[in-house]
Amino acid sequence: MIGNWNYGTGRRKSAVARVFIKSGKGDIIVNGKAINEYFARETSLMIVRQPLELTNHAATFDIKVNVVGGGETGQAGAVRHGITRALIDYDATLKPALSKAGLVTRDAREVERKKVGLRKARRAKQFSKR
């Protein structure tokens, strides 16, 4: 994949996406499948296409993505972050527009760990007065 490919790494929750973009006709391949086959939800497809539509490059690039970890929403967010970074690698003048839309910043929210003595991260056992 060396040559005229631009690269970006995206992360969201526990998902990590490695994104490669090059000039093409708009094909997006995720883990060897077309994007419509890989992501079942329409919202996930919208999330992934956000940086491309914002910069008017929806049909300009062929994109290959390798994504591991997490669930569908986390993977979609990781792919979006990776595409954003790859676009900045391709053309640094796109960064202000992408930053203004909040796509450059990594969403740092992670699942909070379960605490000892509680049922979940913050949910305590039911209190019985008698």
From Swiss-Prot:
GO terms for cellular component: cytosolic small ribosomal subunit. The keyword Ribosomal protein applies. InterPro entries: Ribosomal_Su5_D2-typ_SF, Ribosomal_uS9, Ribosomal_uS9_bac/plastid, Ribosomal_uS9_CS, Ribsml_uS5_D2-typ_fold_subgr. One of its GO terms (biological process) is translation. The keyword Ribosomal protein applies. It holds the Pfam family Ribosomal_S9. One of its GO terms (molecular function) is RNA binding. PROSITE patterns: RIBOSOMAL_S9 (PS00360). Belongs to the universal ribosomal protein uS9 family. Coiled coil: none annotated. NCBIfam families: PRK00132.1 (NF001099). This is Small ribosomal subunit protein uS9. Keywords: Ribonucleoprotein, Ribosomal protein.
